Amino acid sequence: MSDSQTLVVKLGTSVLTGGSRRLNRAHIVELVRQCAQLHAAGHRIVIVTSGAIAAGREHLGYPELPATIASKQLLAAVGQSRLIQLWEQLFSIYGIHVGQMLLTRADMEDRERFLNARDTLRALLDNNIVPVINENDAVATAEIKVGDNDNLSALAAILAGADKLLLLTDQKGLYTADPRSNPQAELIKDVYGIDDALRAIAGDSVSGLGTGGMSTKLQAADVACRAGIDTIIAAGSKPGVIGDVMEGISVGTLFHAQATPLENRKRWIFGAPPAGEITVDEGATAAILERGSSLLPKGIKSVTGNFSRGEVIRICNLEGRDIAHGVSRYNSDALRRIAGHHSQEIDAILGYEYGPVAVHRDDMITR
């Protein structure tokens, strides 16, 4: 084994159930064995687990429920305790304690809450406890949900300061086409940058019991790689897959980390789900992308959503393409009022000012 590393392992519902309606406990036992072996060798392991809704449905005897958010939250509330109990029981066989962390998007949007979550996660790791993370599905609304555990795992990897992120799924990795319908599809072993062409071939491999697909795994890989974290998509059914990843053995698809990782503050900006959106003109787009400039109010064409000063927002060009994320110096109402105006007019319009820029370049990261 190499020197101690931190690995985040994301386990999708399809991996935990084997595509069935119930948790595949024998397979979960094997995955825990692999993690425990790495833990004993001095590595730090973080589990991001799906399966709460599937566990709840199984525990209640597969009830016929309406396809509503309330029904899913009911199942998650029942299943979450069953799921963490299972992880606790299995890791305890190896004398390893686990600690549960339930997160929502709000924990990532607010800088203070982000730092608190980071400190809690790292404290667990520092005390040789395996964090078991899931989204708080029992209470999260659409407005505060991360939305899928692929993206949640990327955020967890950032919080943990991970070296590697392993996304285990029911596919061997990313293919040139959907291997279920195209026998000519080839496994892509190495990716050095995610572009539109790669997103176009990602397809959709959603399990009937889960909420993620290959496209969300690409999103997660993009976030993690830009934060300096190697990301691997591999089949959870492959024997010894977790140990192989830590040994550097080629499995699945490896997304190579960005050579110059983001600094800590920009990791938060990149990982935080945007609280709102602004559209900018061609001049502002060029200034941001080509010259690395701050965004001035003059370049803003429209503001979407309601957000506070200090929240992360999405910056889009006139075609609607996401070009950058950044921390807004003004709230949404103020930006609507000063949009299209010169910076020297801000004080006259608002009666106050927080500086001449809407989003400073030091608080911005291009996509």
Swiss-Prot record:
Subcellular location per UniProt equals: Cytoplasm
Q: Residues in domain PUA? A: 275-353
Question: What SUPFAM superfamilies does the record point to?
Answer: Carbamate kinase-like (SSF53633), PUA domain-like (SSF88697)
GO cellular component assignments = cytosol
Listed A to Z, the keywords are:
Amino-acid biosynthesis, ATP-binding, Cytoplasm, Kinase, Nucleotide-binding, Proline biosynthesis, Transferase
Give the reactions, separated by semicolons, that this protein catalyses: L-glutamate + ATP = L-glutamyl 5-phosphate + ADP
Provide the residue positions that the database annotates as binding substrate. Answer: 50, 137, 149
Q: In which pathway does it act?
A: Amino-acid biosynthesis; L-proline biosynthesis; L-glutamate 5-semialdehyde from L-glutamate: step 1/2
- Could you tell me which SMART domains the record lists for this protein? PUA
* Notes on activation and inhibition: Interaction with gamma-glutamyl phosphate reductase (proA) seems necessary for kinase activity. Requires free Mg(2+). Inhibited by proline and ADP.
Q: Where does ATP bind?
A: 10, 169-170, 211-217
Which Enzyme Commission numbers does its entry carry?
2.7.2.11
- tRNA-binding keyword on record: no
Q: Please state how the activity of this protein depends on pH.
A: Optimum pH is 6.5-7.0.
Question: In its UniProt record, which GO terms are filed under biological process?
Answer: L-proline biosynthetic process; proline biosynthetic process
At the top level, the lineage of the source is Bacteria
In alphabetical order, the GO MF annotations are: ATP binding; glutamate 5-kinase activity; identical protein binding; magnesium ion binding; proline binding; protein homodimerization activity; RNA binding
Query: Which InterPro entries does the entry mention?
Result: AceGlu_kinase-like_sf, Asp/Glu/Uridylate_kinase, G5K_ProB, Glu/AcGlu_kinase, Glu_5kinase, Glu_5kinase/COase_Synthase, Glutamate_5-kinase_CS, PUA
The family annotation for this protein states: Belongs to the glutamate 5-kinase family.
What is said about the domains? Contains an N-terminal amino acid kinase (AAK) domain and a C-terminal PUA domain. The AAK domain is responsible for catalyzing the reaction and for proline and ADP inhibition. The PUA domain modulates the catalytic and regulatory functions of the AAK domain.
Complex formation: Homotetramer. Dimer of dimers. May form a complex with gamma-glutamyl phosphate reductase (proA).
Task: Describe the function of this protein.
Answer: Catalyzes the transfer of a phosphate group to glutamate to form L-glutamate 5-phosphate.
Q: What is this protein called?
A: Glutamate 5-kinase
The protein's organism comes out as Escherichia coli (strain K12)
